[in-house]
Amino acid sequence: MQIYQLSGRNVEVTEPMREYVEEKLSRLDRYTDQITDARVTLTVRDVRNNERRNRVEVQLNVPGGIIRAEEHHADMYAAIDKASDVLERQLRKFKTRYMKQRQEGRPEPLPGPAEAEVNAQGSGAAMDDVSEFHPEIVRQKRFELRPMSAEDAVVQMEALGHDFYVFQDLQGQTGVVYRRRDGHYGLIGSS
């Protein structure tokens, strides 16, 4: 796998570091050749908890979705290892779903996971056995989307006590605001 973007925040990405990332992520090629883009960000942070000092974020674009992992560790190379392991589990799941849909005669490409985000606290161990993963939708909600600004959507989200809020922006596009782990907010919109 070729890494299209490798960047560092508060750290210089050395050639040995680049080679290590490429070596670890090249293992993922055995699961799919449909990775269209790969972005890796290595970050060193000044935090009290040394175990969270180094952060590795990896985002892989596959047909129909994004596969993402974020891992923390005191050692940058160990964080890279952990992120690679998480991505391997997620791609194994992706490949299993893809093959199952092909066998059932469904059209290609497989709609991949909307976003599979895993962090150091929940490193995806529940997904180790892909064949046992059967998601069950236990509740459905339908509601009218009212036009509002992203800031108003955040206010609504906080008022409801939710971690995300789906809304229609002032241009008529659907968007989602969400609470990030760092306490800030994110906005997801369609292109």
From Swiss-Prot:
Subunit structure as annotated in this protein's UniProt entry: Interacts with 100S ribosomes.
Protein name: Ribosome hibernation promotion factor
GO cellular component: cytosolic small ribosomal subunit
Keywords: Cytoplasm, Translation regulation
Keyword check for Acetylation: no
Chain spans, region Disordered: 100-123
Function: Required for dimerization of active 70S ribosomes into 100S ribosomes in stationary phase; 100S ribosomes are translationally inactive and sometimes present during exponential growth.
NCBIfam families, per the entry: yfiA
Organism of this sequence: Deinococcus radiodurans (strain ATCC 13939 / DSM 20539 / JCM 16871 / CCUG 27074 / LMG 4051 / NBRC 15346 / NCIMB 9279 / VKM B-1422 / R1)
Subcellular location, record wording: Cytoplasm
Family note: Belongs to the HPF/YfiA ribosome-associated protein family. Long HPF subfamily.
Single Gene Ontology BP annotation: negative regulation of translational elongation
Domain of life: Bacteria
GO molecular function: ribosomal small subunit binding
Gene name, Swiss-Prot/TrEMBL: hpf
